[in-house]
Structures are given as C-alpha cells and as structure tokens.
C-alpha cells in the first residue's frame, strides 16, 4: 500500500498548491493489532496505545493520536509513511518471512482555519490466514486478523441490506473506520492477487471479499 499512499499524498499536495484556499494536510497512522490501537507516528514512543471513544452522533474518535503536519512537501510525507511501516508489527507466519500481523489505517486529514475539511483513510488489511497453511504459527494474531475481517464483512453486508443496525462496534477496526463507512461515503477496495496455484484459496477469498465491498 505504501507506494499507492505516496502517490495519493503527492496528488493531494499538488491540488492544495493549485487550489490556494488555505487547506493544509495532516497525517496519522494507526495500527490495529490484536484489538489494540497503536499510534505508529507517536513522538512519545514507538507504538503508543490509543483509546477509542464514541462522540457526538455516535461517531467514533481516537483520543491522543499524534496528527503530524502540516505536510509541506512529498518528501516529509514519505518519511512519515516509512516510519509507520517500520513500526508496524510484522513476523514470520510460516508462509511469508515479513507477514503483516496487523491492519494499518493511514489517515490523511485536510484542514483549514474553520476546522476539518475532509478526511481520507487508506487501509492496508492483513490477509486472512488458514491455519492448515501456516501450521498454527502466531495463531493468536491470525485469529484476531480473521475476526476483524469478518466484522468488516458484516458491516458491508449490513450496508448492502440497508439494515437499521450496522455492527460497527463488533471490532476495533470497524469502529475506527465508521466515520468513512457510513452511507453516502465513498469506499474503494484494491486487491492484491497471487497468480500462483498454491495461493488459489486465498486469492478466491480475497476476490469474494472485494465483491462484497463493491456491492456495498
């Protein structure tokens, strides 16, 4: 996701420069690891734990997140994104040496004198894992990864069905994404698919998951 994020930031900075309306760009990076929220850009520690609160209108907010900025150029943004990826939890799951063990939410906030103007969340989801393939290595992490993905699927299904209740609170991931996943918001999903036959079950599952997002 990092290269896509870098291109997105460059485009935002270009448009801000053209617009001349006083907009400023700020960046935060939050990791969802085993149902804990960690600030990957905290200046107070390598991975400070954060608290999720429910504010006005029942919308969620994160207390204490270090909002970095204003971002003046692409190089400063690139350095922050490199730091976030360096601090993100990775490990050997028996299939990949540096497998992502968490979900990463990179938030780009546009602000001006009047307050928040808009926000874009770039989410790098850890892939679902089959215990038969990984051999149970890092099992507790895999369980939480899959549980959060299942909760995200439930939220998408509820939005598709126009359900009265959308279960945002079933996981920290969906609660964190609630402000950008309400009806009327725009959601785009990019899927990384492997052409290898051995990865066919995971590829099929990823494409099926993306199909649900498209319907939502």
Language-model features, listed with the residues they occupy:
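P-loop NTPase "switch/coupling" elements that transmit nucleotide state to mechanical/effector output
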Residues: 1-185, 192-195
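Conserved AAA+ ATPase "sensor/coupling" helix adjacent to the nucleotide-binding pocket
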Residues: 155-159, 206-213
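SF2 helicase/translocase ATPase core recognition
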Residues: 200-201
């Amino acid at each position: 996701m990092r290269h896509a994020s870098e291109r997105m930031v460059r485009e935002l900075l270009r448009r801000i420069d053209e617009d001349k309306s006083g907009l400023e760009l700020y960046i935060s990076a939050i990791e969802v690891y085993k149902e804990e929220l960690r600030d990957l850009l905290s200046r107070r520690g390598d991975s400070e734990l954060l608290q999720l609160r429910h504010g006005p209108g029942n919308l969620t907010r994160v207390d204490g997140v270090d909002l970095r900025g204003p971002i003046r150029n692409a190089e400063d943004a690139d350095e922050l994104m490199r730091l976030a990826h360096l601090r993100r939890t990775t490990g050997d799951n028996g299939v990949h040496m540096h497998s992502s063990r968490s979900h990463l939410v990179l938030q780009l906030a546009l602000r001006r004198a009047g307050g928040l103007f808009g926000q874009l969340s770039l989410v790098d989801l850890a892939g679902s894992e089959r215990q038969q393939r990984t051999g149970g290595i890092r099992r507790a992490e895999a369980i939480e990864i899959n549980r959060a993905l299942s909760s995200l699927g439930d939220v998408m299904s509820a939005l598709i069905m126009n359900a009265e209740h959308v279960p945002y609170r079933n996981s920290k991931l969906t609660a964190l994404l609630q402000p950008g996943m309400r009806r009327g918001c725009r959601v785009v999903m990019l899927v990384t698919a492997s052409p290898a036959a051995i990865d066919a079950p995971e590829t099929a599952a990823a494409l099926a998951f993306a199909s649900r997002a498209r319907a939502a």
